[in-house]
Amino acid sequence: IPDSIFEIAQGAFAESPKLTVLTVSENNRWYVSIDNVLYDAEKTTLLAFAGGNALSEFTVPNTVTLLGRQAFAGAVNLRCVTLGATIKDYGTGTFSSCSALESVILEDETLRVIPEDFFNGCISLHDFSMPPAVERIGARAFQLCSALESITLPRTLTELGDNAFGKCQKLKEIAVPDSVKTMGESVFTGCDHMQSASLPKSMTVLPADTFSFCYALH
């Protein structure tokens, strides 16, 4: 990235799995790259993790308060990420299509929103502890997390977006807490191995395709 660039839009390098090197000119006043990870000059925003970066484990620096849209999207070698409590804002699709990602440690227990497409397509993700204060899970947040076997939804949760857990093929059971007031369509569609599910007692409408193609549900 030359020194003339003063604005890089979020998602500019998303889904680029063969991008192994991401460097910034030393004379650029607005951006910096460390280990092929792109930040703003103050290192408060992480904009892009090179899709072909060889790192398999990564801890986001504690200076970072914002993860840009699709910041890690398509990072094919990444297996484990630690997200510190300093991060207060997440863009959509943060980890979409991180096919090798197995676990994410999220240290901020006050996080209220899991954004849209947060883990969409993370086919190896099997370990994620939902923060206890989460109120909304965005559309497709866990879609195609086909290795995820269990997830506990907190009692603070009020909204589940469309296809939030669509095609989580190994998810065996789910308990939607009574706090949930809004559910989108196809929330659990294609969860092949789901055997049991419980819904809020106050629920009056079951949205379209909520449990469609859940062949093991009984």
Outline where the language-model segments fall.
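Structural signature of tandem-repeat unit edges
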Residues: 1-7, 16-44, 49-66, 75-89, ...
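Consensus positions within tandem repeat domains that build extended binding/scaffold surfaces
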Residues: 10-12, 47-48, 68-71, 91-94, ...
